[in-house]
Amino acid sequence: MAEGGFDPCECVCSHEHAMRRLINLLRQSQSYCTDTECLRELPGPSSDSGISITVILMAWMVIAMLLFLLRPPNLRGSSLPGKPSSPHSGQDPPAPPVD
């Protein structure tokens, strides 16, 4: 414990709060279970929401491929055979005149 009896960890996770959560969980589960049976599927949003991480990753890959294929010509690595790759055709620029 810290000085003065103040425990900063208790602000984040106190035993009373954990017990309240446990009691609420037990109360909620009791409403779905009877003496003879306990429902396996609890009411509420289902875990199978129709969209999975695989679908999201495939969508991102399609977007990345489209952006790659539709990039502007100045960002493409290769150039046309007749077109020079730089303004000086690979040569050093001329030296400035000496006065």
From Swiss-Prot:
Stretches that traverse the bilayer: 50-70
Broad class of where this protein is predominantly found: endoplasmic reticulum
Subcellular location: Endoplasmic reticulum membrane
Tissue and organ expression note: Ubiquitously expressed.
Taxonomic superkingdom: Eukaryota
Gene Ontology biological process terms in this record: blastocyst hatching
Alphabetized UniProt keyword annotations: Endoplasmic reticulum, Membrane, Transmembrane, Transmembrane helix
Lumenal side: 1-49
Cytoplasmic face of the membrane: 71-99
Entry GO CC: endoplasmic reticulum; endoplasmic reticulum membrane
Region (Disordered): 77-99
Membrane topology: Single-pass membrane protein
Listed name of the protein: Small integral membrane protein 14
Organism: Mus musculus (Mouse)
